[in-house]
């Protein structure tokens, strides 16, 4: 367990603004995971270990939409990493343990249960979260959500509360999704992967749609029913009533699978789609553009 002190500087030392967040080590070489919003706009990041040691952190990269950042402790020491579990295996009612530094209170463990496995559409990103009634408060962000075996199943991210303090409705990023994001960050060292959009509306097709469009009953995917003008999808050749079967080599079983791949690729990346159009299988490579909710920010 560790605390982060990200500093943004004004014109003088007195203008220094600091914030506190949490994080955890994922590699014996000292690679550390936290939330992107914990270190956003920071010029200096300090890591305080549970044994009191303080290290300056080196920024490795981040993924803005996923709200994940990867840091490195600049030391030749070997560190003990957290064990990353399998968030697909959790069940509603399982014990959930949040570790962090709420309000700067170090080494705080709070206990609750998994309230929901795949809570969707909590914010503009559409990202899926684990919901828990485990107490998560300011300063807990970026810390691990553990199962009863001490395995990391999520990264504590945010709460739903009218007061700003825990009301028993907290949300964590599933660790399996985080693993995929971290691989993407490792391929874009030194960069912040910014949000992108495809610009389609899609849904699981009804039996009548399958029959009229020649989509096999056993085919898995989503049906495009509308495309935004001047979007990446339109410019990349995607059409209304295309049936999307895969994205970047992975099956698309639900619209959230497609959203996840768009998010992982990020702004400026290329999304490779496998589609069915008029009973013919095709592949499209679509350069992604900036997400509409990010424009002007």
Language-model features, listed with the residues they occupy:
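Glycine-biased strand-turn-strand hairpin within the trypsin-fold
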Residues: 1-32, 40-46, 53-54, 75-77, ...
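Short, surface-exposed secondary-structure boundary micro-motifs
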Residues: 1, 37, 95, 101-102, ...
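Short, well-ordered loop/turn sites that connect or cap secondary structure elements
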Residues: 26-27, 39-40, 84, 90, ...
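Active-site loop architecture of trypsin-fold serine endopeptidases
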Residues: 16-17, 42-45, 79, 99-113, ...
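C-terminal recognition in membrane/secretory proteostasis and scaffolding
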Residues: 22, 58, 72, 91-94, ...
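Short conserved beta-strand and strand-loop elements enriched in small hydrophobics
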Residues: 44-50, 96-100, 269-275
């Amino acid at each position: 367990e560790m605390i982060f002190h990200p500093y943004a500087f004004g014109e003088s030392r007195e203008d220094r603004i600091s914030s506190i967040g949490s994080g955890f080590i994922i590699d014996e070489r000292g690679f550390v995971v936290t939330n992107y919003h914990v270190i956003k706009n920071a010029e200096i990041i300090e890591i305080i270990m549970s044994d009191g040691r303080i290290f300056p952190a080196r920024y490795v990269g981040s993924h803005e939409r996923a709200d994940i950042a990867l840091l490195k402790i600049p030391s030749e020491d070997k560190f003990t990493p957290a064990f990353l579990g399998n968030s697909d295996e959790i069940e509603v009612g399982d014990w959930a343990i949040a570790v962090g530094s709420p309000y700067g209170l170090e080494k705080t463990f709070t206990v609750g249960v998994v309230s929901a496995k795949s809570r969707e559409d909590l914010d503009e990103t559409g990202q899926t979260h684990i919901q828990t009634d485990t107490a998560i408060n300011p300063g807990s962000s970026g810390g691990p959500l553990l199962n009863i075996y001490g395995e990391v199943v999520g990264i504590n991210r945010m709460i739903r509360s009218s007061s700003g303090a825990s009301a028993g409705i907290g949300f964590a990023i599933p660790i399996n999704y985080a693993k995929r994001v971290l691989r993407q960050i490792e391929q874009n060292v030194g960069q912040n992967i910014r949000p992108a959009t495809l610009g389609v509306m899609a849904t699981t097709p009804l039996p009548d749609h399958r029959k009229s469009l020649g989509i096999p009953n056993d085919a898995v995917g989503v049906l495009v029913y509308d495309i935004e003008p001047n979007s990446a999808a339109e410019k990349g050749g995607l059409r209304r009533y295309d049936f999307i079967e895969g994205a970047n080599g992975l099956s698309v079983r639900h619209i959230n699978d497609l959203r996840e791949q768009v998010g992982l690729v990020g702004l400026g990346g290329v999304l490779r789609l496998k589609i069915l159009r008029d009973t013919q299988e095709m592949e499209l490579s679509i350069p992604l553009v900036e997400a509409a909710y990010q424009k002007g920010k």
